[in-house]
């Protein structure tokens, strides 16, 4: 069963320097029907103006990853990490027992467009850690590349939860099929462009809850970039 969450139905926070679309309830946006899905708690589609960003702020007991679509995002944290995240890079910060970080647009002239995604961890109070990896467009072209997993399989980043995240690029006749293990949920998010999921047309910003499906086929893309989350079969996130 596929349940569509239209891009136009998302929450919107427009602060001038920041324009953020919220797939699920976040900050001042509250929707009782959209409180997350399985262990997936947040998908924020953020556009940050040149030279602007989020000052240092704390997190704990959350798996937070950033996926840059355009521009460059500068990250600093209390673990001593300093990095710049660009398209193709995936950054995963496991907040664990507590960490503070800042994120700013690295450019003084161009905006940055990125997704920030939160996954609830399976254990509380773990040691904080930071990971970053680059996945080339070639690895994602016409296929679903594993970018996050519990065990770091195929060069993916390790997440502290029974969740897997795939990224793919699709255009024209390119297609890929993901076989889900039995009794799993999934969530599909179209980061940009348009694509079909099992024949259902999707546009940029659309999301789909997936239940009781074994095969997910992405096809007929137009400059599409897609994230697919393989998740535990539960409706709402539960903090550890």
Language model segments and positions:
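Jelly-roll (double-stranded beta-helix
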Residues: 1-240
């Amino acid at each position: 069963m596929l349940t569509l969450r239209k891009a136009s139905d998302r929450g919107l926070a427009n602060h001038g320097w920041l324009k953020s679309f919220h797939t699920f309830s976040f900050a001042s946006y509250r929707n009782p029907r959209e409180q997350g899905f399985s262990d997936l708690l947040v998908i924020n589609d953020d556009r940050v103006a040149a030279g602007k960003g989020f000052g240092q702020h704390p997190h704990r007991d959350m798996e937070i990853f950033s996926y840059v679509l355009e521009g460059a995002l500068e990250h600093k944290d209390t673990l001593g990490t300093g990095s710049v995240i660009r398209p193709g890079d995936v950054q995963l910060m496991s907040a664990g027992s507590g960490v503070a970080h800042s994120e700013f647009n690295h450019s003084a002239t161009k905006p940055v467009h990125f997704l920030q995604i939160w996954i609830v961890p399976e254990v509380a109070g773990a040691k904080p850690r930071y990971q970053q990896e680059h996945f080339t467009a070639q690895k994602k072209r016409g296929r679903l590349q594993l970018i996050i997993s519990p065990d770091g399989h195929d060069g993916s980043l390790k997440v502290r939860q029974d969740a897997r995240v795939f990224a793919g690029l699709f255009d024209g006749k390119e297609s890929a099929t993901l076989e889900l293990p039995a009794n799993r949920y999934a969530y599909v998010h179209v980061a940009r462009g348009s694509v079909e999921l099992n024949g259902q047309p999707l546009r940029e910003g659309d999301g789909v809850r997936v239940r009781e499906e074994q095969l997910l086929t992405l096809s007929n893309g137009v400059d599409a970039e897609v994230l697919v989350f393989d998740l535990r079969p539960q409706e709402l996130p539960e903090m550890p």
